[in-house]
């Protein structure tokens, strides 16, 4: 949230599965929300306020934003079948997950598969059209998807995980 106006602070609301879970009022325009996420799909909104003595005057609510990520991700490589199996922990509220792979940490991701929320496992055989290479590090991104009204929305996520294919 940017504080381009003369406001005294911001009020944040956090929702899980459409239900209000927490309201936080901060004088700062930034808020660390990693502790709130903890394996949940969270929707949040924010509004500014101005202190007028004993009373606060609130502005309009922003639109909803969504965030969430898996708290635990594991990978295992089967050298006979040359497949990487990736498993992850449940994200509460997720309806499906989109799994992508890249050879770089922050770009070049190629979609592997979208799986239902109950599955939480994917087998990766290739990066694009090429087989996985021994000794190469691959970056896996798991994006939870939630239902927002009639739409399926991909959550913003900070969850990118690396896995190095063994050389043996």
Q: What are the language-model segments listed below?
A:
Residues 23-26, 44, 71-77, 86, ...:
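Generic structural motif
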Residues 5, 16-19, 52-54, 92, ...:
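Solvent-exposed strand-loop boundary residues in beta-sheet-rich modules
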Residues 1-5, 55-93, 151-168:
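Pro/Thr/Ser/Gly-rich low-complexity, intrinsically disordered linker/stalk tracts
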Residues 7-11, 41, 83, 94-98:
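Exposed beta-strand and adjacent loop surfaces of beta-rich binding modules
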Residues 41, 83-85, 121, 137, ...:
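Intrinsic-disorder/low-complexity, polar/charged segments enriched in Ser/Thr/Lys/Arg/Asp/Glu/Gln
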Residues 33-56, 127-152:
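Beta-strand-rich modules
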Residues 11-38, 98-134:
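Recognizes extended acidic, P/S/T-rich segments that occur
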Residues 1, 12-14, 44-46, 88, ...:
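An aromatic-rich alpha-helical recognition segment common to small helix-rich domains
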